[in-house]
Amino acid sequence: MKVIDMAVHEVATITADKTICDCARQMRLEHVGSLVVVNDDQTPLGMITDRDIAIEVVARNLDPMKLTVRDVMTTPVVTAGPSESMVVALARMREFGVRRLPIVDEEGKLVGVISNSNLVEELSSLLDSLVRTFAPRRLEKSPFALTNDVPVEHHRR
């Protein structure tokens, strides 16, 4: 499955010149924990999360009215292409230690975002489908297989 198929397409964004106060306010209004930092033509420049604000601003007792998103955002931004597989996206997230990947088109414009939770939900759904498809067949072949709901001692009798 391609990442674009499981992406969120209405992405919460912010520009780098906004204050951290503006950023936190926007996160609150949009009920999100992260924003993709973009320039005027919607090219991603970085990411900023509520965790970044807590650790880099609040914990250091800095003034959120004086700092800009540019001062705190994570750069460079790690992205994915729309046709990449979820396996490739997961590998990239792991390699770079990120939980979200903005998805950009061939021109570098933002077209969506995918998070590790999106990928885990999709993988979980796929695994569930596989189990529902193949587990009954396996039980037909081996009806005496161990099950989790019966203690091993009962299987030995």
Predicted regions span which residues?
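Short acidic/polar alpha-helix capping motifs at helix-coil junctions
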Residues: 1-3, 17-20, 32-36, 52-56
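A generic short alpha-helical patch detector that favors 3-5-residue windows
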Residues: 15, 43-45, 61-64
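Short, flexible active-site loop motifs that bind/organize anionic cofactors or intermediates
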Residues: 9-13, 43-44, 79, 109
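Low-complexity, intrinsically disordered short peptide segments enriched in small/polar/basic residues
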Residues: 8, 17, 33, 110, ...
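A glycine-centered beta-loop-beta connector
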Residues: 27-30, 35-51, 93, 101-118
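The conserved cystathionine-beta-synthase
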Residues: 13-31, 38, 80-97, 104, ...
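Tandem CBS (Bateman) regulatory domains
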Residues: 1-10, 49-79, 85-94, 115-157
